[in-house]
């Protein structure tokens, strides 16, 4: 794969994270406007998020790796796949892109660019959900890269689609996305004061996934037969 310079990779990370957040926030606004049924609105939000992830990881993965997520970049840095400098640059790009994505979604629906959320998302169940969501996402990515690299876009999109429904938090699983969603007082928002719990849980879940997958994906050492002097040729 061709190596792209850091500037291009950071632009790809900002663009991908921004479009991801625009899809999450925008589809939430659209769904909330079209139906009073929260379950139906979540279905719409889920489909849009899963679909855009498949597209973004496919088209931008060869450019930057398509992290779009500080937790993923941290894991890649800890595993030696990304330098500390590049990790810091990726995170800055992801956060900037994510906030821009919220503003873009708002402008498309004729709302103020940024509007602090008042939606409460806190408590042990929510934090556990975010830890599980991030754990599963990172495990999916690492195992996907190890065994089926070409399937990673679909694996990520399908995992997040499922995690929207089996986690109480609807699977943010991404500190940059969580921060950006604190700037929208709409269906997908999160109160700024609830961010620390989410971010800490996401980072812990990601690091735990790295620790487990490092061991799990390590093949067993081959058995070397020792030849005795009597049986040696």
Swiss-Prot record:
Transmembrane segments: 11-31, 40-60, 89-109, 125-145, 152-172, 193-213
Effect of mutating residue 177 to R: Increases methylarsenite transport activity, leading to lower resistance to methylarsenite. Nearly complete loss of methylarsenate transport activity
Primary residence: membrane
Family: Belongs to the MIP/aquaporin (TC 1.A.8) family. NIP (TC 1.A.8.12) subfamily.
Domain notes: Aquaporins contain two tandem repeats each containing three membrane-spanning domains and a pore-forming loop with the signature motif Asn-Pro-Ala (NPA).
Job description of the protein: Involved in resistance to arsenic. Facilitates efflux of arsenite [As(III)]. Arsenate [As(V)] enters the cell through phosphate transport systems and is reduced to arsenite by the arsenate reductase ArsC. Internally generated arsenite flows out of the cell by downhill movement through AqpS. Can also transport the highly toxic methylarsenite [MAs(III)] and the relatively non-toxic methylarsenate [MAs(V)]. May be a component of an methylarsenite resistance pathway in which methylarsenite enters cells via AqpS, is oxidized by ArsH to methylarsenate, which exits the cells via AqpS.
UniProt-recorded name of the protein: Aquaglyceroporin AqpS
Species of provenance: Rhizobium meliloti (strain 1021)
């Amino acid at each position: 794969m061709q190596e792209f310079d850091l500037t291009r990779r950071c632009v790809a990370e900002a663009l991908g994270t921004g479009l991801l957040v625009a899809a999450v926030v925008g589809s939430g606004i659209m769904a909330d406007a079209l139906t009073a049924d929260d379950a139906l609105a979540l279905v719409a939000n889920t489909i849009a998020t899963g679909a855009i992830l498949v597209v973004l990881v496919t088209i931008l993965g060869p450019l930057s790796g398509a992290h779009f997520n500080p937790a993923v970049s941290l894991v890649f840095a800890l595993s030696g796949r990304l330098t500390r400098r590049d990790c810091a640059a990726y995170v800055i790009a992801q956060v900037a892109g994510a906030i821009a994505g919220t503003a873009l979604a708002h402008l498309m629906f004729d709302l103020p660019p940024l509007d602090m959320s008042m939606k409460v998302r806190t408590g042990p169940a929510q934090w556990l959900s975010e830890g599980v969501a991030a754990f599963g996402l990172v495990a999916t990515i690492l195992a996907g890269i190890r065994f089926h690299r070409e399937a990673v876009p679909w694996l990520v999109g399908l995992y997040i689609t499922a995690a929207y429904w089996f986690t109480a938090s609807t699977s943010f699983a991404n500190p940059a996305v969580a921060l950006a969603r604190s700037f929208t007082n709409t269906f997908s928002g999160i109160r700024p004061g609830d961010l620390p719990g989410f971010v800490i849980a996401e980072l812990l879940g990601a690091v735990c996934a790295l620790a487990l997958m490092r061991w799990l994906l390590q093949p067993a050492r081959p058995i070397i037969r020792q030849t005795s002097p009597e049986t040696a040729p």
